[in-house]
A protein has these predicted regions:
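Intrinsically disordered, low-complexity linker/terminal regions across diverse proteins
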Residues: 2, 52, 196, 255-258, ...
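Active-site-surrounding "flap" and adjacent substrate/cofactor-binding loops of secreted or lumenal enzymes
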Residues: 2-5, 18-22, 27-88
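Flexible glycine/proline-enriched surface loops and loop-helix/loop-strand junctions
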Residues: 5-9, 150-154, 561-563
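A charge-rich, low-complexity, intrinsically flexible signal that marks solvent-exposed coils, linkers
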Residues: 8-20, 568
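Extracellular/periplasmic catalytic domains that process cell-envelope and extracellular macromolecules
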Residues: 16-20, 134-136, 464-467, 620-622
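Short, solvent-exposed loop/turn and secondary-structure capping segments
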Residues: 35-39, 129, 153-155, 207-209, ...
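Short secondary-structure subsegments characteristic of cysteine-rich extracellular domains
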Residues: 41-63, 186-206, 492-498, 615-620, ...
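Noncatalytic, helix-rich "gating/capping" subdomain that lines the substrate-entry/channel surface
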Residues: 64-367, 371
């Protein structure tokens, strides 16, 4: 009796025109990209999105079950779907906030009003987050970050290239002011909207760019209350916090979770100090009416889901169509699922795991992760550019990695979330914001819960958290093409194996390498090794700076100088993760073959190549070839041009084709797999290839 092995790839979908040596990404994904037409309600679609769509349908089934065990999620979802009630409520959701802004007679009163809005979600000039202190990662602390903008980032306010987007933004703001009856006519609305853009442009002038905010050292600025208060002397930090405390104390959430706001802010981490001092100067110089206008507009923009349909439609016209190229709003139930996932995802996620995640997948993943960690151990030990002292510290960090697979073992308690079936959507959202405020701020000063997940199990993604030194793989990503328990190992190591390797690699990328095995921001590198590492990463930055996504090269074919490039400095962390992930996953695949053959694992390149050569040939492809074909398939993606351009500005991930071809051309075994020659499109001279881990 013979057993047919499942290759885990789909050769019938590959290109008959382009070969892998010319363009690996187009060979695997080109026919699909050429054939697939994005639905009007999507600005992108691909392998990740297909799995997200599957999870979306599964969550809907749970939420619409009459006996839904996730009662809070069910109630929130139902209130969001009640469009008639939302439309009938008019401006009720924001009337109190608008009134509080209007009656402020001076800046001190406006500060008080903004603070009072915080518990239930109000406009933010200052961003607040709670997680581990990089200097003492076992304890949670407040992180203060730049905020206050409605466009994706500060570049949108200053670069000529974004002038059309700024014009559309002004148009959207004008329409929202009219929708809210805050402008008498089009002329007044347009004038106010232009003033609003001017105000935000002044705020944006103090923002750090996306490359600077990636610097873990520069963004770690422990600050006590006196220093923070001095930085925000004119904004009046005392008044802001006191009004926040007073407003919170009057809510039901305070009875469940009392908070001492002054104590919470005793010690904080400021990420961008010059933003705070710049914000303070802006606040001091700004006209009161301009500050009120900024606050009004952000109240509206932040509440469009809770307001009548014209607010939602106006919001979509800009954020959906103009910024992302999406032609049509997603149907209501899909947006409702996304909302529930964001507000109380573990509530419904617990049921999702029961119904859709087999325990056998978790066990298989544990084997994969074990081989990946073994492969990293070998790569670090055998590194030619890393000194012995740094190697030992890297190995110590690796030994402290904690993998988490599928779902949390410590589900969040939603008993304090006062979401009810008989409440309106705005009321339920207010309750959700109050719950989240109490939940997050109550963690300040307490020990970090390493069992807490930052993603729901129904999320198609994975992450590495440097202050906890954990790698996390939610249940929803553990499906084909990433993971197929019935496939031969090549496809799984090229798919989820590369993702696992990528996330472990974040522990040793330009950011993660600054944290030790306990999650502490700690310079554990020798100067020589750090210089070697920076030299390697600069080569990778230079490579990626040269890339222009094919679709944008075609869009700007008449004026190539205007075509936007990948930002190698912005994407370097993810690119290191990708490159490390592929190289390490290849070794791990060889180790898996060794286990099957009963051989001892040997990390030398000769042994790795010998093991890979013994992989079975399936569907006409060797194991080594199937590995790379599987890797390319997970990046199957199609974007609208607008979204592709936005991603180049703000996303630390490179475009899908660069994550495929840009990585493969740096991996020596790729050349062996497909007999790549100097005249082939994928060729990169050996001395230009970057080898890190």
């Amino acid at each position: 009796m013979s057993t047919t092995l499942n290759s885990g790839i789909d050769p019938a979908s590959f290109s008959a025109v382009t070969g892998p040596a010319q363009d690996l990404f187009r060979y695997v994904n080109g026919p699909w990209i050429d054939m697939y037409r994005l639905p009007d309600d999507r600005s992108r679609y691909g392998s990740f999105d297909k799995l997200a769509e599957d999870a979306e349908n599964q969550i809907r089934e749970i939420l619409e079950d009459d006996d839904c065990p996730a009662e809070k999620s069910h109630a929130l979802y139902a209130s969001f779907l009640d469009v008639d009630a939302i439309n009938a409520s008019g401006l009720a959701a924001i009337e109190d906030q608008l009134k509080a802004i209007d009656v402020a007679a001076d800046k001190a009163e406006l500060t008080r009003s903004l603070g009072a809005m915080n518990p239930a979600g109000g406009p933010d000039l200052i961003g607040i987050a709670v997680y581990g202190d990089p200097g003492a990662p076992e304890t949670n602390i407040i992180h203060i970050e730049q905020s206050g903008l409605g466009l994706p980032d500060e570049a949108y306010y200053r670069e000529d290239h974004y002038a059309p987007i700024r014009e559309a933004y002004v148009d959207m703001v004008a329409k929202q002011l009219k929708n809210a009856k805050l402008a008498a006519d089009d002329e007044q609305a347009e004038a106010q909207a232009q003033r609003f853009l001017d105000v935000e442009t002044r705020i944006a002038a103090n923002h750090w760019d996306n490359v600077a905010t990636r610097d873990s050292v520069k963004t770690y600025n422990p600050t006590d209350y006196a220093e923070l208060s001095g930085m925000l002397a004119d904004y009046d930090l005392d008044t802001w916090i006191e009004s926040w405390q007073s407003a919170y104390d009057q809510t039901s959430a305070a009875q469940v979770q009392p908070l001492d706001f002054r104590g919470i802010f005793n010690h904080v981490v400021v990420h961008e100090p010059s933003f705070l001092t710049g914000l303070n100067a802006f606040w001091k110089a700004a006209d009161l009416d301009d500050l009120k206008l900024w606050a009004r507009v952000h109240v509206i923009i932040g509440s469009t889901l809770e307001l009548p349909h014209e607010f939602d439609e106006t919001n979509f016209e800009f954020y959906g169509k103009t910024l992302s190229g999406q032609k049509q709003q997603r149907v209501r139930w899909k947006r409702g699922v996304s909302l529930v996932n964001g507000v109380c995802g573990e509530d419904v996620g617990r049921e999702y795991v029961k119904r859709h995640f087999p325990e056998s997948s978790k066990q298989r993943m544990e084997q994969l992760v074990g081989n990946l960690i073994d492969a990293y151990r070998v790569s670090i030990s055998n590194s030619a550019w890393l000194g012995e002292e740094t190697k030992q510290k890297a190995l110590e960090k690796l030994s402290k990695f904690v993998p988490k697979i599928g779902y949390t073992n410590h589900w969040r308690d939603y008993s304090a979330l006062d979401v009810r079936e008989n409440a309106g959507f705005a009321e339920n959202m207010r309750a959700a914001n109050l719950y989240e405020t109490g939940y997050q701020l109550a963690k300040v000063g307490k020990s970090v819960d390493k069992d807490e997940w930052l993603m729901n199990p129904q999320t198609v993604n994975a992450y590495y958290e440097p202050t906890m030194n954990v790698i996390v793989f939610p249940a929803a990503i553990l499906q084909p093409p990433f993971f197929d328990p019935n496939a031969e190992d090549a496809a799984n190591y090229g798919g989820i194996g590369a993702v696992i390797g990528h996330e472990i690699g974040h522990g040793f990328d330009d950011q993660g390498a600054q944290y030790d095995g306990d999650g502490k921001l700690n310079d554990w590198w020798t100067e020589e090794d750090k210089a070697n590492f920076e030299q390697l990463t600069q080569k990778l930055i230079d490579q990626y700076n040269a890339f222009v996504p094919t679709q944008l090269a075609e869009k700007y074919a008449d004026d190539p100088a205007q075509a936007p490039h990948v930002n190698g400095a912005l994407t370097i962390g993810e690119n290191i993760g990708d490159l490390s992930g592929v190289n390490i996953a290849l070794k791990a695949y060889a180790f898996a073959l060794d286990e099957v053959a009963g051989r001892e694992k040997n990390g030398s390149m000769e042994a790795i190549e010998a093991s890979l050569a013994e992989a079975p040939e399936i569907d006409g492809f060797t194991g080594l070839q199937r590995f790379f074909l599987s890797y390319a398939s997970i990046w199957r993606t199609k974007n609208r041009d607008e979204l592709a351009e936005q991603y180049l500005q703000i996303d630390p991930h490179s475009p899908a084709e660069c994550r495929t071809n840009g990585i493969a051309r740096n991996v020596d075994l790729f050349y062996k797999a497909f007999d790549v020659k100097p005249e082939d499109g994928m060729w990169l001279d050996p001395d230009q290839r970057v080898r890190i881990w």
